[in-house]
Amino acid sequence: MKKIHFSLLMLAIVVICTSCKREPQPMAYITSHLNVPITLYNEKDSVFLAPMQRTYLCDVEVENGKFTHCGGVNWTFCVFDPVIKIALLDTTYTVPEQYQLFLADVDSYMYHLSYSSSSSSPVKYESSCYDYVLRPDFVKEILRGAVANK
């Protein structure tokens, strides 16, 4: 009888230890190409721009304190001083500036070639257009409940 109790105890320890070694599952898995609806809002003109459904979240490479590379361009728009909002988990969030990366900071950019969501043809934009990248840690902050909706 003692052998049976000992065997059951050992089996329980093995099962518990095996389950301890499993990687904890995150609340939501953030991929590098998460599909997040984006709304761009031009506060000056009170105009909502059409959301682009495909949004690229990417890891940021910084060299000497300067942004150098992203895995994909998130969205392009041609208005000044927009308020960027994202819709996630049925809630809209305003994206703080520290979570945005401003890409159009090179004076030599006369235009930017981009692909529209409805066509595979490149579209030429004037120099007043900007590319923004949403830092993935902002979405992680939302998912862990650290960001209030606005």
Segments predicted by a language model, with ranges:
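N-terminal "first-domain core" detector
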Residues: 24-26, 30, 34-40
